[in-house]
Amino acid sequence: MTSSHNNLLQNFQEYLSVEKGLSDNSIYSYGYDLNKFKNFLEKEHIDFLKVQADDIMRFLNEEKDRKISSKTIAREVVAIRQFYKFLKDEKKLDTNPTEKIETPEVMRSIPDYLTQDEIEELFASIKEDNLYELRDKCIFELLYSSGLRISEACNLRLNDMDLEGMTLTVEGKGGRQRLVPFGEKSLDILNRYLKQSRPFILKSRNCEYLFVSKKGSYINRKSVWRLLNHYIKRTSILKKVTPHTLRHSFATHLLENHADLKSVQELLGHIDIATTQIYTHMANKTLREVHKKFHPRG
């Protein structure tokens, strides 16, 4: 049981790093809280994948009995909730056992994003005459111009593309499908990738996935994260940048240019518009900075 529990936790922490772009400290905090929960389950001989809401409540009540602070318990609930949401999205579970557990009030942090100038600097650092770099630029172009999650981009298959209609059929969290448009720049680099880069990398091998690795299979999330870090080092950008930062940038730039919130929600594949609303704070922050810089009463 311990080995399978550790594997699930490791997969979750990789997801937090690669897809959610959390800091090392945040990932450590999630891991610390979930290890406490894991130890409780193993003491009770309960498997992660067979947990019920009552089991979680017994763990939380034990924490209260040990005089653990309410702030720490609230953090533990968030960690457990996010972990089981991840397991459900990964189709390890049919239901999330935390759904009946009251969500504590916690402040959501505003995610980091790149400015439009920083996006251009990043893309300019990638050399399109190198066929591997052409592939990488194509991946980053879709992450930014279509707001894809890194897992969605890595899982794209050739038949998910409609080049004529300039759309992608994307399978998001929980197996939900959505149609995502892309623009002329994406179409141009996709065509060049398909004609030049992809055949060069595959070397006569077959693969159903759009983005391929040297091994002839699909490129994984961790590889894309490493590649993005490599290109960021070529720029003057000092922010921590992950593939998810490009998705944050996509949403922020749409709202800065007055896209309506409902449309952005649909493009991102969010079920709850409250998840999308966090980006309005980011856009409003930019507007405040413009006002302060350029208005005589700023």
Swiss-Prot record:
PROSITE patterns documented for this protein: CB, TYR_RECOMBINASE
Gene Ontology CC entries for this record: cytoplasm; Holliday junction resolvase complex
Gene Ontology biological-process annotations: cell division; chromosome segregation; DNA recombination; DNA transposition; resolution of DNA recombination intermediates
Family matches, as InterPro entries: CB, DNA_brk_join_enz, Integrase-like_cat_sf, Integrase_catalytic, Integrase_recombinase_N, Integrase_SAM-like_N, Recomb_XerD, Tyrosine_recombinase_XerC/XerD
Subcellular location: Cytoplasm
Residue intervals of the Tyr recombinase domain: 109-292
SUPFAM superfamilies in the record: DNA breaking-rejoining enzymes
Active site residues of this protein: 149, 173, 244, 247, 270, 279 (o-(3'-phospho-dna)-tyrosine intermediate)
Keyword ATP-binding: no
Main location: cytoplasm
One example GO MF annotation: DNA binding
Main function: Site-specific tyrosine recombinase, which acts by catalyzing the cutting and rejoining of the recombining DNA molecules. The XerC-XerD complex is essential to convert dimers of the bacterial chromosome into monomers to permit their segregation at cell division. It also contributes to the segregational stability of plasmids.
Protein name: Tyrosine recombinase XerD
Organism: Leptospira interrogans serogroup Icterohaemorrhagiae serovar Lai (strain 56601)
